[in-house]
Amino acid sequence: MGSLCLQKLSAVERLFALESFELPEVPCSLSFHRHPEYKSITREANEWAFKCTRRDLSPEEKKSLLQWKVPMVTCLSTAHAPKENMVASAKFAWAIAFLDDPIDDNEVAATSYLDTVLSLCNGTASLAEVPDIVAYRACHDLMKDLRSLLQPELFKRTVSTVEGWARSISSDDLKQDYKLYRRNNIFILPLFYTLIGASFEDEDVESPDFVSAQNAMLDHIWMVNDIFSFRNEFYKKKLNNLPAVLLLTDPSVQTFQEAVNATCRMIQDKEEEFIYYRNILAANASRNGKDFLKFLDVLSCAIPANLAFHYASSRYHGMDNPLLAGGTFHGTWILDPKRTIIVSDPNRSNGAASNKLNQIQDLSKLI
């Protein structure tokens, strides 16, 4: 036990001195579907986000927000949803970004902040009763739209998901499993409920196979996020990401590079797990409603859509980074506080992985 502790102490010391690591290719065999009206959907959602700030944004400030590419996951998750649902889902993506940032930056007391968010979602508080910040304004305006757009059952399910996210964020249980914690605080399912705009039978979304498929999708999403957000976390002196957790807790992981490699393998395992359960659900399609199957298809698209977003968003790579032009990258990730720097070695390319990522290479730059 003492030897293991000393090994981990040495690993943590090296982590704090980290200057670079190797980012492997992250292959994805699933396909996303870009909505034909993605340009107007993106424009409307972005203009709404600008209005929520209640500021006369400078061109540079607008450019900074636009490079986040927040509506991207929505626009790549289905080609068939009604435009009003797409716009509402893209607004939801913006609301999530606005809600998430104050917590990440420790700008608010989490418990009172989340209580206010839930009061706005449930309609038990008015905007005039809460502090005037962008997250509350976005939440209030969005919920007003969703109440009129969604069926009552689906709106209730959406609010319930918000409540689950709030509980996970405000929990003071320091002994809970990190992977379960991250699965619970990935606040993305409401985007997909809004896209479909239809409710499902509880027995469909509570079946063991569907829960397993959904959990695999959520795990893939947060694991990708943990890899691509590492630079931001590192310079905030936070260890709230899977590679750091593996380095600290897994006896078989002795270096940060081993932790990154293990995380990327887990991402691939989660894709395969999702496909396995999705195929089981599709084989039983005759007993499920068409809306449920549309929802399952959206979850399938969400995996590559989220991956494309993480390659292309300035939230992870810094403003005006050439990497934001679209496509994937891999190689030596040189840590820098302002931007992602990748030094690629073309001789180390994995052809099979590259072929799987062709769709992201071709389309992510168009959003």
Model-derived regions, located:
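Alpha-helical, largely C-terminal catalytic domains
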Residues: 1-367
